[in-house]
Structures are given as C-alpha cells and as structure tokens.
C-alpha cells in the first residue's frame, strides 16, 4: 500500500519565505546564546568542570589522575581537598 503521508515536501519547505524568516532569527540566536553560555563561564558552573586556571593549584602541579579504582572516592576527596 503506497500512499502519501500528507506532509509537505522538503523542497517546498526550503524554498518558502516563512522558513527563512523564522530560521534567519533562530539560528543566529542559538549561536549567540551558546557563545554567551561558554564565554561567561556559566558552562563551567552548570556542568561542574574546573575552569582552565583551576586544573593545577599551588600545592599540586601534577595532573590529578585517579589510579586506584577501588579507592577512587578517597583519591577524589584528596585531590579536591574535601575533608
């Protein structure tokens, strides 16, 4: 049973003025929002990753690697100075 789904063909959507009016606003807006999210540092706060200047402290200049999988929680606490 062949038939049509009743949807508009993709070529009609791409050539419509309405599509480009909507997307000429939304695509740059998403780009600007993403740029602001990263450049203001909010991405670091939301995802909990250290900022580039926080990877190495004055006390610890080596890479913070977890080496023992069974005592990883203790290593994380030690590396992040959580007591």
Curated annotation (Swiss-Prot):
Tell me where in or outside the cell this protein is found. Answer: Plastid, Chloroplast thylakoid membrane
- For this protein, what does the record note about how its cofactor is bound? With its partner (PsbF) binds heme. PSII binds additional chlorophylls, carotenoids and specific lipids.
Q: How does it sit in the membrane?
A: Single-pass membrane protein
Name one molecular function that GO assigns to this entry: iron ion binding
Q: Which Gene3D superfamilies match?
A: Photosystem II cytochrome b559, alpha subunit (1.20.5.860)
Per its UniProt record, the required cofactor names are:
heme b
Q: What Pfam family is a match for this entry? A: Cytochrom_B559
Which key words tag this protein in UniProt?
A: Chloroplast, Electron transport, Heme, Iron, Membrane, Metal-binding, Photosynthesis, Photosystem II, Plastid, Thylakoid, Transmembrane, Transmembrane helix, Transport
State the GO CC annotations: chloroplast thylakoid membrane; photosystem II reaction center
Q: Say if the entry is tagged with keyword Electron transport.
A: yes
Q: Which residues cross the membrane?
A: 21-35
Question: Where does this protein hold heme?
Answer: 23
> Which Gene Ontology terms describe the biological processes this protein takes part in?
photosynthetic electron transport chain
Query: Which InterPro entries does UniProt cross-reference here?
Result: PSII_cyt_b559_asu (IPR006217), PSII_cyt_b559_asu_sf (IPR037025), PSII_cyt_b559_CS (IPR006216), PSII_cyt_b559_N (IPR013081), PSII_cytb559_asu_lum (IPR013082)
Q: What does this protein do?
A: This b-type cytochrome is tightly associated with the reaction center of photosystem II (PSII). PSII is a light-driven water:plastoquinone oxidoreductase that uses light energy to abstract electrons from H(2)O, generating O(2) and a proton gradient subsequently used for ATP formation. It consists of a core antenna complex that captures photons, and an electron transfer chain that converts photonic excitation into a charge separation.
Tell me the NCBIfam families matching this sequence. cyt_b559_alpha
Q: Which family does it belong to?
A: Belongs to the PsbE/PsbF family.
The entry describes its oligomerization and partners as: Heterodimer of an alpha subunit and a beta subunit. PSII is composed of 1 copy each of membrane proteins PsbA, PsbB, PsbC, PsbD, PsbE, PsbF, PsbH, PsbI, PsbJ, PsbK, PsbL, PsbM, PsbT, PsbX, PsbY, PsbZ, Psb30/Ycf12, at least 3 peripheral proteins of the oxygen-evolving complex and a large number of cofactors. It forms dimeric complexes.
Protein known as: Cytochrome b559 subunit alpha
Q: Which organism was this protein described from?
A: Tupiella akineta (Green alga)
